[in-house]
């Protein structure tokens, strides 16, 4: 391995004993061998530590470094520790229950060199519980400015995930994943995009994302206060740059507000429980009809959903349930 690897692959591990070895194998099978793998064990209560140790003892690889944190600290803390330890020029953050396809690094770096982008996003395959796959790409293939990418991210026109892209590590100087209970990926990515010169999107599925009910955002109800903290984070990120007062910036923040409360409402409707009615009521008042009408013009699906949530939660529940079944095959 070169003194400075091209890519640092940061993989948090928590309660994924059944999948983590396959995830590690998918990294070690990369056609681009110039990487380091940082395995960040987050106080995992299962036998992940033992399985990883046994595998690496049988298959030693100098590119792999394991950090065994006995106390659970959360996903953001693990990624931040990985960033502190990373030596690569680029970083990526696969989950330990997913898999990289063999050419993940090779193809993303090819497009980075071709376009000069500081972030390259790829498509991914969603692998359902029955083994079927569906290709998904959020965004239009091509290259955007960092500002354009930031606004597109807020409007849900680009992938908000940490695992389907490579990012120049220099963009994380002064940037870390916040301790927020939802969308911490999107928060850090927004800050990176606001620093980036250009961002490229490619229509090549290079990542396999395992879909399960527990892995989706509606597997639990996020407290309303966390949604407010998320929106405050978005606003402060734009305020630190010249983008906050731009009309496009304000539009993006408005649409992000509608989307954030829609997502929170979806959790309440699907999960249910004692807290659901209060959360649902807070989501319905979290954005205005004017906000929804603006979203209707720019992001029609979200605008229509926002207006529907404000007028008929029963119909909204029915339509969203049909959407989940169609998209995720659950």
Predicted features along the sequence, with ranges:
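Amphipathic alpha-helical repeat scaffolds of TPR domains
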Residues: 253-263
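Sequence-pattern detector for short linear motifs
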Residues: 9, 82, 139, 150, ...
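Juxtamembrane/interfacial segments around transmembrane helices
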Residues: 166, 238-243, 306-314
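Residue-level recognition of alpha-helix termini/interfacial anchor residues
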Residues: 249-250, 312
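Catalytic core of nucleotide-sugar-dependent glycosyltransferases
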Residues: 206-212, 219-248, 262-291
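Nucleotide-sugar donor-binding/catalytic module of glycosyltransferases
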Residues: 1-227, 308
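Membrane-interface aromatic/basic loop that binds lipid-linked glycans or pyrophosphate carriers
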Residues: 269-330
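Catalytic-loop motifs flanking and including active-site residues across diverse enzymes
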Residues: 188, 230, 257
